[in-house]
């Protein structure tokens, strides 16, 4: 009897195949949170928030106007990372590209919301920047981007479940590597 180990979905054990999907989520979260976290606090620092409040637009329109440009920029970034990953590193997207973009859009909404929350509770742009990094650093180490969640202590596994990047990475790796969707 000969025992052979078979690696599914990444038989060459290529690190690019594992890292490129994770990089999409990391870049999305990093940029979206940092950019959005300064959106409202910048207006407060410049004392223009009062002018925005008295305009005839509704609060929802104000928030949408603040985050929509960042959402468009981030969707372009997703396309760029996918293009570089596919053309430069040879990582093939085995699943549905439309599903991948839809999931990226949902994840983008959550990261923009986190950035907006940071922006509304911060008093200065520097404080918003620090709070953004406070949320980003655990995401890098606990989300499964670098270390497998199964190898983490139970307490960190619980923490990983509340981080949006964890769930995004599972889905995106499923779409790109396994061909889900």
Where are these regions (language model features)?
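Pore- or pathway-lining transmembrane helices of multi-pass membrane proteins that form conduits
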Residues: 126-143
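Hydrophobic alpha-helical transmembrane segments of polytopic membrane proteins
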Residues: 100-122, 140-143
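Alpha-helical transmembrane segments of integral membrane proteins
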Residues: 25, 106, 126, 157-160
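Transmembrane helix-boundary elements of multi-pass transport/secretion proteins
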Residues: 1-100, 121, 127-130, 151, ...
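Transmembrane alpha-helical core positions of polytopic small-molecule transporters
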Residues: 26, 30-31, 42, 74, ...
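Membrane-interfacial helix-loop-helix junctions in multi-pass membrane proteins
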Residues: 9-12, 92, 143-181
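Active-site proximal loops enriched in glycine and acidic residues that flank catalytic Cys/His/Asp
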Residues: 66, 122, 133, 163, ...
């Amino acid at each position: 009897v000969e025992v052979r180990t078979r690696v599914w979905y990444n038989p060459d054990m290529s690190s690019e195949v594992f890292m490129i999907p994770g990089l999409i989520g990391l870049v999305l979260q990093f940029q979206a949170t940092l950019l959005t976290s300064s959106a409202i606090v910048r207006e407060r620092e410049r004392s223009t928030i009062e002018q925005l409040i008295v305009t005839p637009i509704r609060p929802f329109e104000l928030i949408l106007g603040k985050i929509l440009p960042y959402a468009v920029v981030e969707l372009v970034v997703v396309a760029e990372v996918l293009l570089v990953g596919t053309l430069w590193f040879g990582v093939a997207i085995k699943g549905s590209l439309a599903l991948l973009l839809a999931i990226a859009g949902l994840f983008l909404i959550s990261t923009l919301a986190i950035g907006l929350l940071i922006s509304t509770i911060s008093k200065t742009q520097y404080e918003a920047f620090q709070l953004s990094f406070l949320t980003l650093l655990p995401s890098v180490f606990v989300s499964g981007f670098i270390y497998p969640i199964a190898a983490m202590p139970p307490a960190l596994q619980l923490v990983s479940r509340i981080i949006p990047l964890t769930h995004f990475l599972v889905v995106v790796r499923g779409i790109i590597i396994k061909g889900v969707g």
